[in-house]
Amino acid sequence: MGAAIAIAGSVILRVLCGTNSRPDTLQAPIIVAFLIACVVAMLFGAFNGVLVAYFKIQPMVATLILYTAGRSIAAWINNNELPIVSDPTFSYFGGFIPGIPIPTPFFIAAACVLVIFLILKFTTLGLYTQSVGINENSSKLNGLNPTFIKFLTFVILGLCVAVAALIKVSRLSSINYSVIAKDIEMDAILAVALGGNSLSGGKFNMAASILGAYVIQFLTTTLYKFDVQSDALPAYKAVVVILLVVLSTPKVREWLSAVGKKLKQSKTIKEVG
């Protein structure tokens, strides 16, 4: 995901700056640059979708290809230069619009969440997606096409990546290929797990995942407050990921449930005695 954001962000800057890495004016409208980035990001999403859905490659392995090569592709798009956009309007997407105290990314994120919520809640796509996540074979027997649904999910992810890229590159009006959205994959996993959603797929709670994302941001800010170096942050987050993954396994849940029942029974016996 982070590498895909780097690619989409690089495309945006390439379109806006053209052949000059530091133009005085924009070489194309921002909306055009964003739409082109959307197409590129969706194509890379489709690439991952084909590997996972049609070639049955494990998602972790399939996405590892882009994870490894993505940042090099992003640097190649701009000839390994660091383009800078001087137009102040571009910085509004990652910062503040004059006169509005709330950051623009908040409005963008809220709009994206609302659109995705409406699609998943009031269209068949949401039902089909959850059905495939719960039981792919059962969905197929009921007439669904799990292969296409999984492919479409990766394409939609590409669109979300383009939105994230716009916010990321507009904050600095430039890009650092090796740093932009670094380790964001771990944050995404943590947000989903903290929200109580199953990492193996199925039913999900978007509101809980959003809350999980805020918890991750709070954790990051707190660690910085205690003077933890940025290079050490992934180690702390990895510990949290391991704990959450272990606690979410069926065997551990059964064990915790059994312990809870025993404690409840012992408490009842003491009260009766």
Q: Which residues make up each language-model segment?
A:
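Membrane-embedded helix boundary and interhelical linker motif in transport proteins
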Residues: M1-A46
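Hydrophobic alpha-helical transmembrane segments
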Residues: A3-I7, I31-V39, V61, F106-A111, ...
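Hydrophobic core segments of alpha-helical transmembrane domains in multi-pass membrane transport
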Residues: G9-V11, C38-A41, Y67-S72, I108-L118, ...
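Short loop segments and helix-boundary regions at transmembrane helix junctions
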Residues: L16-G18, T25-L26, M42-V85, I119-T124, ...
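Helix-loop-helix "hairpin" substructures at the membrane interface of multi-pass membrane proteins
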Residues: P29-A37, F44-N48, G99-N176
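Transmembrane helix-bundle core of multi-pass membrane transporters
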Residues: I31, F55, P59-F122, I149-L152, ...
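Cytosolic-side transmembrane-helix boundaries in multi-pass membrane proteins
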Residues: L141-F148, L219, L223-G273
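Transmembrane alpha-helical segments in multi-pass inner-membrane proteins
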Residues: V161, L172, N176-A238
